[in-house]
UniProtKB/Swiss-Prot annotation:
ATP binds at K485. Its EC number is 6.1.1.9. The keyword NAD does not apply. It comes from Trichomonas vaginalis. This is Valine--tRNA ligase. One of its GO terms (molecular function) is valine-tRNA ligase activity. Gene3D superfamilies: HUPs. It comes from the Eukaryota. GO terms for biological process: valyl-tRNA aminoacylation. Pfam families: tRNA-synt_1. Keywords: Aminoacyl-tRNA synthetase, ATP-binding, Ligase, Nucleotide-binding, Protein biosynthesis. The gene is VALS. A motif ('KMSKS' region) lies at residues 482-486. It catalyses: tRNA(Val) + L-valine + ATP = L-valyl-tRNA(Val) + AMP + diphosphate.
Amino acid sequence: DHAGIATQFRVEKKIYDEKKLHRGEYSREYFLEEAHKWVESKSGTILSQLRDMGSSLAWKDTYYTLDEKLSESVIAAFIKLFDEGLIYRSERLVNWDCALKTAISDAEVEYITLTKRTKLNVPNHKYPQYPFGVMAHFYYEICDKDGKKTGEKVEIATTRLETMLGDTAVAINPKDARYNHLHGMYVWHPIREVPIPIIQDEILVDMNFGTGVVKVTPGHDPNDYEVYKRHPEIGLISILTPDGAIAPGYGQFSGMMRFDARVEMVKWMKEHGLYKEEKDHEMRLGITQRGHDIVEQVITPQWFVNTTDMAARAIKAVDDGELKIVPDEFVVDWKKWHENIRPWCISRQLMWGLRIPAYRVQIDGKWAEGNGEWVAAASQEEAIAKGAKANNVVPSRVTVEQDPDVLDTWFSSALLPFSGVGWPSNEERLNRYFPNSILETGWDILTFWVSRMVMMSLTLTNKVPFHTILLHPLVRDAQGRKMSKSFGN
Protein backbone atom coordinates (compact mmCIF):
# COMPACT_ATOMS: atom_id res chain seq x y z
CA ASP A 1 0.00 0.00 0.00
CA HIS A 2 1.49 3.37 -1.00
CA ALA A 3 -0.04 4.89 2.18
CA GLY A 4 -0.51 8.43 0.80
CA ILE A 5 -0.28 11.06 3.51
CA ALA A 6 1.69 8.83 5.91
CA THR A 7 4.40 8.20 3.33
CA GLN A 8 4.58 11.84 2.25
CA PHE A 9 4.98 12.91 5.89
CA ARG A 10 7.80 10.41 6.46
CA VAL A 11 9.65 11.26 3.24
CA GLU A 12 9.36 15.02 3.85
CA LYS A 13 10.81 14.47 7.32
CA LYS A 14 13.65 12.39 5.84
CA ILE A 15 14.43 15.11 3.26
CA TYR A 16 14.47 17.75 6.00
CA ASP A 17 16.65 15.64 8.31
CA GLU A 18 19.17 14.97 5.54
CA LYS A 19 19.05 18.14 3.41
CA LYS A 20 17.35 20.71 5.71
CA LEU A 21 14.82 21.41 2.93
CA HIS A 22 11.13 22.15 3.55
CA ARG A 23 8.27 21.37 1.17
CA GLY A 24 8.17 24.13 -1.43
CA GLU A 25 11.97 24.24 -1.59
CA TYR A 26 12.18 21.25 -3.95
CA SER A 27 10.28 20.09 -7.01
CA ARG A 28 7.54 17.47 -7.21
CA GLU A 29 9.91 15.38 -9.37
CA TYR A 30 12.65 15.45 -6.71
CA PHE A 31 10.17 14.47 -4.00
CA LEU A 32 8.78 11.56 -6.05
CA GLU A 33 12.30 10.29 -6.75
CA GLU A 34 13.11 10.31 -3.01
CA ALA A 35 9.75 8.74 -2.14
CA HIS A 36 10.23 5.86 -4.58
CA LYS A 37 13.68 5.14 -3.09
CA TRP A 38 12.19 5.12 0.43
CA VAL A 39 9.32 2.85 -0.65
CA GLU A 40 11.70 0.37 -2.29
CA SER A 41 13.75 0.08 0.89
CA LYS A 42 10.67 -0.41 3.07
CA SER A 43 9.00 -2.85 0.65
CA GLY A 44 11.94 -5.22 0.93
CA THR A 45 11.76 -5.05 4.72
CA ILE A 46 8.00 -5.74 4.74
CA LEU A 47 8.35 -8.82 2.51
CA SER A 48 11.31 -10.23 4.46
CA GLN A 49 9.42 -9.79 7.73
CA LEU A 50 6.40 -11.62 6.30
CA ARG A 51 8.67 -14.50 5.27
CA ASP A 52 10.42 -14.53 8.67
CA MET A 53 7.01 -14.96 10.33
CA GLY A 54 6.39 -18.05 8.21
CA SER A 55 3.61 -16.55 6.13
CA SER A 56 2.21 -18.89 3.48
CA LEU A 57 1.39 -16.50 0.65
CA ALA A 58 1.29 -16.47 -3.15
CA TRP A 59 4.51 -14.49 -3.47
CA LYS A 60 4.28 -14.34 -7.28
CA ASP A 61 1.04 -12.36 -6.88
CA THR A 62 2.59 -9.59 -4.79
CA TYR A 63 1.28 -6.21 -5.93
CA TYR A 64 1.77 -2.57 -5.03
CA THR A 65 -1.06 -0.03 -5.12
CA LEU A 66 0.87 2.34 -7.41
CA ASP A 67 2.03 -0.29 -9.91
CA GLU A 68 0.77 -0.11 -13.48
CA LYS A 69 -2.01 -2.70 -13.27
CA LEU A 70 -3.44 -1.42 -9.98
CA SER A 71 -3.24 2.17 -11.21
CA GLU A 72 -5.17 1.21 -14.35
CA SER A 73 -7.89 -0.33 -12.16
CA VAL A 74 -8.14 2.78 -9.99
CA ILE A 75 -8.34 5.07 -13.02
CA ALA A 76 -11.02 2.85 -14.60
CA ALA A 77 -13.07 2.97 -11.39
CA PHE A 78 -12.80 6.76 -11.13
CA ILE A 79 -13.85 7.23 -14.77
CA LYS A 80 -16.82 4.87 -14.44
CA LEU A 81 -18.07 6.53 -11.24
CA PHE A 82 -17.53 10.01 -12.72
CA ASP A 83 -19.38 9.16 -15.92
CA GLU A 84 -22.29 7.79 -13.87
CA GLY A 85 -22.46 11.02 -11.85
CA LEU A 86 -21.32 9.36 -8.61
CA ILE A 87 -18.05 11.33 -8.47
CA TYR A 88 -18.41 15.09 -8.59
CA ARG A 89 -16.50 18.27 -7.73
CA SER A 90 -17.93 20.59 -5.11
CA GLU A 91 -17.05 23.11 -2.43
CA ARG A 92 -17.89 21.58 0.93
CA LEU A 93 -16.55 21.58 4.47
CA VAL A 94 -13.65 19.16 4.88
CA ASN A 95 -11.09 18.28 7.55
CA TRP A 96 -8.01 20.39 6.81
CA ASP A 97 -4.41 19.86 7.94
CA CYS A 98 -2.79 23.33 7.91
CA ALA A 99 0.71 21.92 8.46
CA LEU A 100 0.49 19.61 5.43
CA LYS A 101 -1.90 21.94 3.54
CA THR A 102 -4.27 19.17 2.49
CA ALA A 103 -7.72 17.78 3.11
CA ILE A 104 -7.56 14.69 5.35
CA SER A 105 -9.94 11.85 6.16
CA ASP A 106 -11.68 11.24 9.47
CA ALA A 107 -9.30 8.29 9.90
CA GLU A 108 -6.39 10.74 10.12
CA VAL A 109 -7.94 12.71 12.98
CA GLU A 110 -7.37 11.76 16.62
CA TYR A 111 -9.53 13.34 19.31
CA ILE A 112 -8.48 14.45 22.77
CA THR A 113 -10.80 15.55 25.56
CA LEU A 114 -9.86 18.65 27.55
CA THR A 115 -11.61 19.12 30.89
CA LYS A 116 -10.19 22.57 31.60
CA ARG A 117 -7.80 25.22 30.28
CA THR A 118 -4.89 23.30 28.74
CA LYS A 119 -1.83 24.58 26.86
CA LEU A 120 -0.90 22.75 23.65
CA ASN A 121 1.84 23.01 21.04
CA VAL A 122 0.72 24.15 17.58
CA PRO A 123 3.09 23.88 14.57
CA ASN A 124 4.30 26.98 12.71
CA HIS A 125 3.12 29.50 15.31
CA LYS A 126 4.79 32.35 17.20
CA TYR A 127 4.52 31.08 20.78
CA PRO A 128 5.54 27.69 22.22
CA GLN A 129 2.03 26.88 23.47
CA TYR A 130 -1.57 28.11 23.24
CA PRO A 131 -4.52 27.65 25.63
CA PHE A 132 -7.45 25.42 24.67
CA GLY A 133 -10.41 24.25 26.72
CA VAL A 134 -11.46 27.89 27.20
CA MET A 135 -14.83 29.49 26.44
CA ALA A 136 -14.43 33.14 25.45
CA HIS A 137 -17.38 35.51 26.03
CA PHE A 138 -17.61 38.66 23.91
CA TYR A 139 -20.23 41.17 22.80
CA TYR A 140 -21.82 42.10 19.51
CA GLU A 141 -23.54 45.49 19.36
CA ILE A 142 -27.11 45.59 17.99
CA CYS A 143 -27.70 47.77 14.91
CA ASP A 144 -30.10 48.21 12.01
CA LYS A 145 -29.41 47.13 8.43
CA ASP A 146 -27.55 50.39 7.79
CA GLY A 147 -25.23 49.84 10.76
CA LYS A 148 -26.84 52.38 13.10
CA LYS A 149 -26.30 51.08 16.65
CA THR A 150 -29.13 50.94 19.20
CA GLY A 151 -26.93 50.90 22.31
CA GLU A 152 -27.84 47.28 23.16
CA LYS A 153 -25.38 44.36 23.17
CA VAL A 154 -25.75 40.58 22.97
CA GLU A 155 -23.31 38.18 24.61
CA ILE A 156 -21.69 35.43 22.52
CA ALA A 157 -19.68 32.46 23.81
CA THR A 158 -17.19 30.49 21.71
CA THR A 159 -14.17 28.20 22.08
CA ARG A 160 -12.87 29.42 18.70
CA LEU A 161 -12.70 33.21 19.02
CA GLU A 162 -10.69 33.68 15.81
CA THR A 163 -13.54 32.24 13.74
CA MET A 164 -15.74 35.24 14.59
CA LEU A 165 -13.88 36.92 11.74
CA GLY A 166 -15.98 34.70 9.47
CA ASP A 167 -19.34 35.14 11.23
CA THR A 168 -22.09 35.90 8.71
CA ALA A 169 -25.00 35.96 11.19
CA VAL A 170 -26.00 35.43 14.79
CA ALA A 171 -28.95 33.17 15.53
CA ILE A 172 -31.75 33.17 18.09
CA ASN A 173 -34.60 30.74 18.68
CA PRO A 174 -37.86 32.11 17.23
CA LYS A 175 -39.69 30.95 20.37
CA ASP A 176 -37.38 32.88 22.72
CA ALA A 177 -39.51 35.81 23.93
CA ARG A 178 -36.43 37.56 25.35
CA TYR A 179 -35.33 38.42 21.84
CA ASN A 180 -38.62 39.15 20.06
CA HIS A 181 -37.54 42.78 19.70
CA LEU A 182 -34.44 41.68 17.76
CA HIS A 183 -36.34 40.02 14.92
CA GLY A 184 -35.22 41.66 11.68
CA MET A 185 -32.31 43.43 13.38
CA TYR A 186 -28.54 43.13 12.85
CA VAL A 187 -25.31 43.13 14.85
CA TRP A 188 -22.25 45.18 13.98
CA HIS A 189 -19.18 43.17 13.02
CA PRO A 190 -16.45 45.30 14.63
CA ILE A 191 -13.52 44.01 12.56
CA ARG A 192 -15.10 43.68 9.11
CA GLU A 193 -17.13 46.85 9.91
CA VAL A 194 -20.37 45.56 8.38
CA PRO A 195 -23.81 44.69 9.80
CA ILE A 196 -24.63 40.97 9.85
CA PRO A 197 -28.21 39.69 10.29
CA ILE A 198 -29.87 38.23 13.36
CA ILE A 199 -31.63 35.12 12.05
CA GLN A 200 -34.14 32.78 13.66
CA ASP A 201 -33.20 29.11 13.75
CA GLU A 202 -34.92 26.66 16.06
CA ILE A 203 -32.65 23.75 15.10
CA LEU A 204 -29.33 25.42 15.97
CA VAL A 205 -30.31 27.44 19.04
CA ASP A 206 -31.35 25.89 22.35
CA MET A 207 -32.87 28.87 24.15
CA ASN A 208 -32.26 27.19 27.52
CA PHE A 209 -28.50 26.92 26.93
CA GLY A 210 -26.14 29.83 27.51
CA THR A 211 -27.38 33.23 26.44
CA GLY A 212 -29.59 31.84 23.67
CA VAL A 213 -27.63 33.82 21.07
CA VAL A 214 -25.25 31.86 18.83
CA LYS A 215 -22.60 33.03 16.35
CA VAL A 216 -22.90 31.48 12.87
CA THR A 217 -19.69 30.73 10.94
CA PRO A 218 -20.72 28.58 7.94
CA GLY A 219 -17.22 28.50 6.45
CA HIS A 220 -15.64 26.78 9.46
CA ASP A 221 -18.26 24.77 11.37
CA PRO A 222 -20.40 21.83 10.18
CA ASN A 223 -23.47 22.82 12.22
CA ASP A 224 -23.23 26.40 10.97
CA TYR A 225 -22.83 25.13 7.42
CA GLU A 226 -26.21 23.40 7.82
CA VAL A 227 -27.63 26.74 9.01
CA TYR A 228 -26.29 28.32 5.81
CA LYS A 229 -28.13 25.68 3.76
CA ARG A 230 -31.35 26.63 5.57
CA HIS A 231 -30.60 30.38 5.31
CA PRO A 232 -28.49 30.78 2.14
CA GLU A 233 -28.94 34.54 2.20
CA ILE A 234 -26.36 34.85 5.01
CA GLY A 235 -23.54 33.62 2.75
CA LEU A 236 -20.30 32.04 3.94
CA ILE A 237 -16.73 33.26 4.32
CA SER A 238 -13.46 31.35 4.53
CA ILE A 239 -11.03 33.24 6.76
CA LEU A 240 -7.96 30.98 6.42
CA THR A 241 -5.20 30.53 3.88
CA PRO A 242 -4.11 26.91 3.18
CA ASP A 243 -1.34 27.11 5.82
CA GLY A 244 -3.71 28.33 8.55
CA ALA A 245 -2.99 32.06 8.47
CA ILE A 246 -5.75 34.68 8.52
CA ALA A 247 -6.59 35.62 4.92
CA PRO A 248 -6.48 39.21 3.57
CA GLY A 249 -9.41 41.46 4.42
CA TYR A 250 -9.39 41.22 8.22
CA GLY A 251 -7.43 44.32 9.17
CA GLN A 252 -4.48 43.97 11.48
CA PHE A 253 -5.14 40.25 11.95
CA SER A 254 -4.57 39.32 8.30
CA GLY A 255 -1.34 37.39 7.84
CA MET A 256 -1.21 36.18 11.47
CA MET A 257 -1.31 32.44 12.12
CA ARG A 258 -4.80 31.62 13.38
CA PHE A 259 -3.98 31.09 17.05
CA ASP A 260 -1.68 34.12 17.14
CA ALA A 261 -4.68 36.05 15.82
CA ARG A 262 -6.79 34.63 18.66
CA VAL A 263 -4.35 36.01 21.24
CA GLU A 264 -4.30 39.44 19.58
CA MET A 265 -8.09 39.52 19.17
CA VAL A 266 -8.58 39.11 22.92
CA LYS A 267 -6.37 42.17 23.49
CA TRP A 268 -8.18 44.15 20.77
CA MET A 269 -11.63 43.29 22.10
CA LYS A 270 -10.65 44.26 25.63
CA GLU A 271 -9.41 47.63 24.37
CA HIS A 272 -12.74 48.20 22.60
CA GLY A 273 -14.96 47.06 25.47
CA LEU A 274 -16.20 43.99 23.60
CA TYR A 275 -14.58 41.23 25.68
CA LYS A 276 -16.38 40.03 28.80
CA GLU A 277 -14.51 37.03 30.22
CA GLU A 278 -13.21 33.53 29.61
CA LYS A 279 -13.99 30.32 31.50
CA ASP A 280 -12.64 26.78 31.58
CA HIS A 281 -14.72 24.61 29.27
CA GLU A 282 -14.68 20.88 28.58
CA MET A 283 -14.21 20.22 24.89
CA ARG A 284 -13.22 17.58 22.35
CA LEU A 285 -10.40 18.68 20.08
CA GLY A 286 -9.36 17.07 16.78
CA ILE A 287 -5.61 16.64 16.23
CA THR A 288 -4.02 15.55 12.95
CA GLN A 289 -2.27 12.18 13.21
CA ARG A 290 0.77 13.18 11.17
CA GLY A 291 1.64 16.81 11.87
CA HIS A 292 -0.05 16.98 15.31
CA ASP A 293 -1.80 20.18 14.26
CA ILE A 294 -5.29 21.31 15.28
CA VAL A 295 -7.76 20.13 12.63
CA GLU A 296 -9.68 22.90 10.89
CA GLN A 297 -12.98 22.73 9.06
CA VAL A 298 -12.65 24.67 5.81
CA ILE A 299 -14.57 25.11 2.57
CA THR A 300 -12.46 24.07 -0.42
CA PRO A 301 -13.17 22.62 -3.87
CA GLN A 302 -12.64 18.87 -3.67
CA TRP A 303 -13.72 15.65 -5.38
CA PHE A 304 -16.45 13.65 -3.65
CA VAL A 305 -18.19 10.30 -4.03
CA ASN A 306 -21.97 10.34 -3.60
CA THR A 307 -22.35 7.36 -1.27
CA THR A 308 -26.07 7.61 -0.40
CA ASP A 309 -27.35 4.76 -2.61
CA MET A 310 -24.15 2.74 -2.07
CA ALA A 311 -24.69 2.89 1.70
CA ALA A 312 -28.27 1.65 1.36
CA ARG A 313 -26.99 -1.36 -0.58
CA ALA A 314 -24.35 -2.05 2.11
CA ILE A 315 -27.08 -2.15 4.78
CA LYS A 316 -29.28 -4.40 2.62
CA ALA A 317 -26.40 -6.85 2.06
CA VAL A 318 -26.17 -7.38 5.83
CA ASP A 319 -29.95 -7.47 6.34
CA ASP A 320 -30.34 -10.08 3.58
CA GLY A 321 -27.59 -12.30 5.02
CA GLU A 322 -25.38 -11.88 1.96
CA LEU A 323 -22.74 -10.31 4.21
CA LYS A 324 -22.08 -11.54 7.75
CA ILE A 325 -20.29 -9.44 10.40
CA VAL A 326 -18.51 -11.25 13.27
CA PRO A 327 -18.90 -10.41 16.15
CA ASP A 328 -22.49 -9.45 15.33
CA GLU A 329 -22.40 -6.61 17.91
CA PHE A 330 -20.80 -4.52 15.14
CA VAL A 331 -23.93 -4.77 12.98
CA VAL A 332 -25.39 -1.83 14.93
CA ASP A 333 -22.29 0.28 14.13
CA TRP A 334 -22.50 -0.79 10.49
CA LYS A 335 -26.09 0.35 10.13
CA LYS A 336 -25.63 3.58 12.08
CA TRP A 337 -22.62 4.57 9.97
CA HIS A 338 -24.35 3.90 6.66
CA GLU A 339 -27.64 5.51 7.67
CA ASN A 340 -25.81 8.75 8.48
CA ILE A 341 -23.21 8.63 5.72
CA ARG A 342 -21.85 11.83 4.18
CA PRO A 343 -20.24 12.44 0.78
CA TRP A 344 -16.75 10.93 0.73
CA CYS A 345 -13.93 13.39 -0.02
CA ILE A 346 -11.41 11.55 -2.19
CA SER A 347 -8.97 14.32 -3.20
CA ARG A 348 -5.74 15.21 -1.40
CA GLN A 349 -3.43 18.18 -1.96
CA LEU A 350 -0.31 16.01 -1.87
CA MET A 351 2.52 15.00 -4.19
CA TRP A 352 2.50 11.31 -3.24
CA GLY A 353 -0.23 9.11 -4.66
CA LEU A 354 -2.13 8.42 -7.87
CA ARG A 355 -2.93 11.68 -9.60
CA ILE A 356 -6.66 12.25 -10.08
CA PRO A 357 -7.63 11.35 -13.69
CA ALA A 358 -9.81 14.44 -14.08
CA TYR A 359 -9.12 17.19 -16.61
CA ARG A 360 -10.47 20.73 -16.72
CA VAL A 361 -11.52 21.72 -20.22
CA GLN A 362 -10.72 24.91 -22.11
CA ILE A 363 -12.46 25.92 -25.34
CA ASP A 364 -10.45 28.43 -27.38
CA GLY A 365 -8.49 29.33 -24.25
CA LYS A 366 -11.53 29.89 -21.99
CA TRP A 367 -12.63 27.49 -19.25
CA ALA A 368 -15.70 25.49 -20.18
CA GLU A 369 -18.71 25.67 -17.86
CA GLY A 370 -21.42 23.38 -16.55
CA ASN A 371 -21.27 19.64 -17.28
CA GLY A 372 -18.50 20.21 -19.82
CA GLU A 373 -16.07 21.86 -17.41
CA TRP A 374 -14.48 18.59 -16.22
CA VAL A 375 -13.97 15.20 -17.85
CA ALA A 376 -12.46 11.98 -16.48
CA ALA A 377 -10.04 10.18 -18.76
CA ALA A 378 -7.11 7.77 -18.79
CA SER A 379 -4.95 10.08 -20.91
CA GLN A 380 -4.70 13.65 -22.15
CA GLU A 381 -5.74 12.57 -25.66
CA GLU A 382 -8.84 10.83 -24.33
CA ALA A 383 -9.64 13.91 -22.21
CA ILE A 384 -9.48 16.19 -25.26
CA ALA A 385 -11.84 13.89 -27.17
CA LYS A 386 -14.26 13.74 -24.23
CA GLY A 387 -14.02 17.50 -23.69
CA ALA A 388 -14.86 18.14 -27.34
CA LYS A 389 -17.86 15.80 -27.20
CA ALA A 390 -19.15 17.23 -23.90
CA ASN A 391 -19.00 20.78 -25.29
CA ASN A 392 -20.09 19.89 -28.83
CA VAL A 393 -16.97 21.36 -30.48
CA VAL A 394 -14.18 19.98 -32.65
CA PRO A 395 -11.13 18.62 -30.74
CA SER A 396 -8.80 21.23 -32.26
CA ARG A 397 -10.52 23.91 -30.16
CA VAL A 398 -9.96 21.99 -26.92
CA THR A 399 -7.09 22.02 -24.44
CA VAL A 400 -7.15 20.29 -21.06
CA GLU A 401 -5.35 20.62 -17.73
CA GLN A 402 -5.13 17.68 -15.32
CA ASP A 403 -6.06 18.27 -11.69
CA PRO A 404 -2.81 18.39 -9.66
CA ASP A 405 -4.36 16.64 -6.64
CA VAL A 406 -3.96 12.94 -5.84
CA LEU A 407 -6.53 10.38 -4.77
CA ASP A 408 -7.16 9.48 -1.15
CA THR A 409 -5.32 6.22 -0.40
CA TRP A 410 -8.59 4.79 0.90
CA PHE A 411 -10.04 5.08 -2.62
CA SER A 412 -7.53 2.63 -4.09
CA SER A 413 -7.76 0.48 -0.93
CA ALA A 414 -11.53 0.25 -1.39
CA LEU A 415 -11.02 -1.48 -4.76
CA LEU A 416 -8.45 -4.09 -3.64
CA PRO A 417 -10.74 -7.16 -3.40
CA PHE A 418 -11.29 -6.97 -7.17
CA SER A 419 -8.54 -4.64 -8.50
CA GLY A 420 -5.92 -6.95 -6.95
CA VAL A 421 -7.22 -9.91 -8.98
CA GLY A 422 -7.55 -8.38 -12.42
CA TRP A 423 -10.60 -6.07 -12.56
CA PRO A 424 -11.61 -4.82 -15.06
CA SER A 425 -9.39 -6.39 -17.76
CA ASN A 426 -8.61 -9.96 -16.60
CA GLU A 427 -12.04 -11.54 -16.37
CA GLU A 428 -10.74 -15.11 -16.07
CA ARG A 429 -8.62 -14.31 -13.00
CA LEU A 430 -11.36 -12.14 -11.51
CA ASN A 431 -13.91 -14.96 -11.76
CA ARG A 432 -11.46 -17.37 -10.12
CA TYR A 433 -10.57 -15.24 -7.09
CA PHE A 434 -13.53 -12.90 -6.59
CA PRO A 435 -15.50 -12.55 -4.43
CA ASN A 436 -13.41 -13.52 -1.40
CA SER A 437 -14.83 -15.78 1.30
CA ILE A 438 -13.66 -13.83 4.35
CA LEU A 439 -12.01 -10.55 5.36
CA GLU A 440 -10.19 -10.54 8.69
CA THR A 441 -9.19 -7.10 9.98
CA GLY A 442 -9.18 -4.79 13.00
CA TRP A 443 -12.50 -3.33 14.15
CA ASP A 444 -11.13 0.22 14.04
CA ILE A 445 -11.27 0.45 10.24
CA LEU A 446 -14.75 -1.02 9.78
CA THR A 447 -16.04 2.30 8.46
CA PHE A 448 -12.90 3.71 6.84
CA TRP A 449 -11.97 0.62 4.83
CA VAL A 450 -14.43 -2.29 5.09
CA SER A 451 -17.49 -0.17 4.41
CA ARG A 452 -15.90 1.38 1.34
CA MET A 453 -14.80 -1.99 -0.05
CA VAL A 454 -18.39 -3.20 0.21
CA MET A 455 -19.85 -0.05 -1.35
CA MET A 456 -17.34 0.06 -4.22
CA SER A 457 -17.69 -3.65 -4.91
CA LEU A 458 -21.48 -3.57 -5.02
CA THR A 459 -21.41 -0.50 -7.27
CA LEU A 460 -18.69 -1.62 -9.71
CA THR A 461 -19.17 -5.43 -9.78
CA ASN A 462 -22.68 -5.88 -8.37
CA LYS A 463 -21.27 -8.38 -5.84
CA VAL A 464 -20.20 -8.20 -2.20
CA PRO A 465 -16.38 -8.40 -2.00
CA PHE A 466 -16.50 -11.15 0.66
CA HIS A 467 -19.22 -13.02 2.52
CA THR A 468 -17.87 -12.73 6.08
CA ILE A 469 -16.19 -9.85 7.93
CA LEU A 470 -14.22 -11.13 10.93
CA LEU A 471 -13.15 -8.27 13.21
CA HIS A 472 -10.33 -8.69 15.71
CA PRO A 473 -9.29 -6.56 18.71
CA LEU A 474 -6.24 -4.30 18.50
CA VAL A 475 -2.70 -5.19 19.56
CA ARG A 476 -1.43 -2.24 21.60
CA ASP A 477 1.95 -1.05 22.82
CA ALA A 478 3.10 -0.77 26.45
CA GLN A 479 1.35 2.61 26.76
CA GLY A 480 -1.98 1.25 25.54
CA ARG A 481 -1.73 2.92 22.13
CA LYS A 482 -2.63 1.15 18.89
CA MET A 483 0.11 0.49 16.36
CA SER A 484 0.57 3.64 14.32
CA LYS A 485 3.06 5.02 11.80
CA SER A 486 2.69 8.45 13.41
CA PHE A 487 3.60 7.05 16.85
CA GLY A 488 6.51 5.13 15.36
CA ASN A 489 5.58 2.06 17.41
